[in-house]
Swiss-Prot record:
Pathway where this protein functions: Cell wall biogenesis; peptidoglycan biosynthesis
Organism: Fusobacterium nucleatum subsp. nucleatum (strain ATCC 25586 / DSM 15643 / BCRC 10681 / CIP 101130 / JCM 8532 / KCTC 2640 / LMG 13131 / VPI 4355)
Molecular function, one GO term: glutamate racemase activity
SUPFAM superfamilies, per the entry: Aspartate/glutamate racemase
Signal peptide: none
EC number: 5.1.1.3
Superkingdom of origin: Bacteria
Organism placement in taxonomy: Bacteria, Fusobacteriati, Fusobacteriota, Fusobacteriia, Fusobacteriales
GO BP terms: cell wall organization; peptidoglycan biosynthetic process; regulation of cell shape
Protein name: Glutamate racemase
PROSITE patterns cross-referenced by the UniProt entry: ASP_GLU_RACEMASE_1, ASP_GLU_RACEMASE_2
Location of the active site: 76 (proton donor/acceptor), 186 (proton donor/acceptor)
InterPro entries for the chain: Asp/Glu/hydantoin_racemase, Asp/Glu_race, Asp/Glu_racemase_AS_1, Asp/Glu_racemase_AS_2, Glu_race
Gene3D superfamilies reported in the protein's UniProt record: 3.40.50.1860
Length: 264
């Protein structure tokens, strides 16, 4: 049986999930977190099959179970598209997916039910958002746009790419004229939100905000909110390099991080 003092597990293919972690820390600072960055197997969004993604994420869930997690957040849109149902069948602990959160926050913000989603190739081609929208809000019209290079560019250093503005213009020009809301459908994208917002006039929404609400609701309903007074501990585990990951995560989160490298 789960206990209040157990940890919250968050995972992503790399740095992107830190955008979700930051929102969680702001709202639930007393919780203990384990962040699993599978950057040794990055990228998830191109070149991997659904089956491969299911196996990779199953291994991560095993890691969380062994490390005493009470709830898991799939802070990766690609993994959520490929594996959320598979993981929920395999594991009994609560698992929160980011695609559902993205559809929910878009539904709350759109005035005309026309939204666009920028995401990885896998998420777009698998129609992760369109399929989930049919289940959660059938009136939503969803335009999915695959920004093939973005996650890799952000993971390795967005500002080092001279063609970033050109690519931004290319992909953002695909947003339909009648769309009034843009969903950041990859957790890496909030890291370049400022650049995205400079190029468009419609509302930009980040599913991480909805993830926080769902996490609070789930933990409250299960009586698992950590009620200790001191700030929680955050431990990072990565399957790839730490020399770029560590300073980038620290700069974004505004604090030093405790990080360990584990086999991929």
């Amino acid at each position: 049986m789960a206990e209040k003092t157990q940890r919250i597990g968050i995972f992503d293919s790399g740095l992107g999930g830190t955008t979700v972690l930051k929102e969680l820390i702001n709202s639930l600072p007393n919780e203990d977190y384990i962040y699993y960055g599978d950057n040794g197997n990055f990228p998830y969004g191109s070149g991997k099959t659904k089956n491969e993604l299911q196996k990779l994420t199953e291994r991560i869930l095993d890691f969380f179970v062994k490390n005493n997690c009470k709830l898991v957040i799939v802070a990766c849109n690609t993994a959520s598209t490929a594996a959320i149902d598979y993981l929920r069948e395999k594991f009994s602990l609560p698992i929160i997916g980011i695609i559902e959160a993205g559809v929910k926050i878009a539904s709350k913000n759109t005035k005309n039910k026309n939204i666009a989603v920028i995401s990885t190739k896998f998420t777009a081609e698998s129609h992760g958002y369109k399929n989930k929208a049919k289940m959660l809000d059938s009136e939503l019209n969803v335009k999915e746009i695959a920004c093939i290079e973005f996650a890799q560019m952000i993971e390795t250093g967005w500002d080092t790419f001279d063609n970033r503005k050109e690519l931004l213009n290319k992909y953002l020009s695909e947003i339909p004229k009648n769309a009034d809301t843009l969903v950041l459908g990859c957790t890496h994208y909030p890291l370049i939100r400022e650049d995205i917002e400079k190029n468009i006039k419609i509302k930009v929404v980040d599913p991480a905000v909805e993830i926080v609400e769902r996490t609070i609701q789930t933990l409250t309903s299960l009586n698992l909110l950590n009620d200790k007074k001191e700030r929680g501990r955050i431990i990072f585990f990565v399957t790839g390099e730490t020399y770029h990951f560590k300073p980038t995560a620290e700069k974004f989160l505004g604090k030093e991080i405790e990080i360990y490298r584990i086999p991929k």
